[in-house]
Swiss-Prot record:
Topology in the lipid bilayer: Multi-pass membrane protein
UniProt organism field: Aspergillus japonicus
Organism superkingdom: Eukaryota
Lineage, uppermost ranks: Eukaryota, Fungi, Dikarya, Ascomycota, Pezizomycotina
Cystine bridges: none
Segments passing through the bilayer: 31-51, 55-75, 92-112, 131-151, 169-189, 217-237, 255-275
Protein name, UniProt field: Efflux pump himE
GO cellular component: fungal-type vacuole; plasma membrane
Length: 321
């Protein structure tokens, strides 16, 4: 609803029932303050780690998403004192809806680098293709969710069809995010299977091989998987929540929201911070960066390394004969 019908113009707890508020409950001050503080700390940690390890692309998605999470929980804290206010409700609704789509971009850029660590030859797609395709999907999801939120926000109370159109567009955006995350997980599993089946076709570069065998690397992969699954679960929940509309019982269940929205995103960002690629790539984050110009160079370097190994093996065979 637009602010022309804002219940805060005439409603207080003493005058209006909670069913006239934008959410049918009083948001928990302690719970929302906890998430606000947690995401603020994680944002600061991400900034420090980015400066230390120069992981600017990784920072972009996480910082953008975390800023939106912080704004969203500020809105929910404001709703604690007055759930009839439209402004804080809009802050919470839009920011917490689109924030995870931006967070997902940081996950997507990691897959291309993981492919370089293991070897491009066994991948179905080039490293840059993974990043470009999924970031593009993320952008589509983001635009749909933002557009749906904007349409819903300007609909007056008597413009049910317009409000429902906005909700449907938001659902489409969230559904596209679920679909892209599902495809991303499927391609990750496919690549993992190819790595498992082709251990002799992995990148022969010594530093890449050592990185693959390190405990920190394995922990990084586990953390990335955990973050992906957590955001996926959250997105499925939000699709189901919006499917019933803003006045459904699911959309007004605070415990479910704090668990399947707040906790899932918290788990994801904690994993993406504690197991930061700057800490787990052993100084190879920049070396695994692709670009249109360097993609071919990387392939030639791997070919040269492989040729060097073959030449050494041939010399060894000649020496033995």
């Amino acid at each position: 609803m637009s602010n022309s019908t804002d219940p805060s113009d005439y409603c207080t707890f003493e005058i209006c029932p909670i069913t006239e508020a934008y959410v049918y409950y009083v948001p928990s001050l302690a719970g929302n303050a906890f998430y606000l503080a947690l995401f603020a700390v994680l944002l600061a940690a991400q900034l420090v780690l980015a400066v230390r390890y120069r992981t600017w692309g990784y920072l972009a998605g996480l910082s953008g998403g975390l800023i939106l999470e912080i704004i969203g929980y500020i809105g929910r804290i404001q709703l604690h004192s007055n759930p009839f206010r439209f402004g804080p409700y809009l802050e919470y609704l839009i920011c917490l809806t689109i924030g995870p789509a931006i967070l997902s971009a940081s996950i997507y850029i990691c897959l291309g680098r993981i492919v370089i660590v293991y070897g491009e030859g066994i991948s179905r797609l080039r490293p840059k293709t993974y990043t470009m395709v999924f970031v593009a999907c993320d952008l589509v999801s983001l635009v749909l969710q933002a557009a749906g939120g904007a349409i819903t926000s300007v609909a007056d109370a008597d413009q049910y069809d317009l409000a429902q159109d906005g909700i449907n567009i938001m659902i489409a955006g969230l559904a596209s995010q679920v679909a892209s995350l599902a495809l991303f997980m499927a391609l990750c599993l496919d690549y993992a299977w190819r790595v498992y089946k082709s251990p002799h076709n992995l990148s022969p570069e010594t530093r890449m091989r050592d990185l693959r065998h390190s405990l920190r690397w394995k922990a990084f992969l586990a953390g990335l998987a955990l973050a992906t699954v957590a955001i996926f679960m959250r997105s499925v929940f939000r699709v189901a929540e919006l499917k019933g509309g803003f006045h459904s019982s699911l959309a007004n269940d605070q415990v479910l929201f704090m668990t399947l929205e707040g906790a899932m995103i918290a788990i994801a960002v904690i994993a993406l911070t504690v197991l930061h690629p700057g800490l787990c790539f052993d100084g190879l984050w920049d070396q695994t960066k692709w670009s249109f110009r360097r993609s071919r160079d990387s392939e030639m370097q791997l070919i040269e390394v492989s040729a060097g190994h073959e030449a050494k093996a041939q010399r060894a065979d000649l020496g033995m004969s």
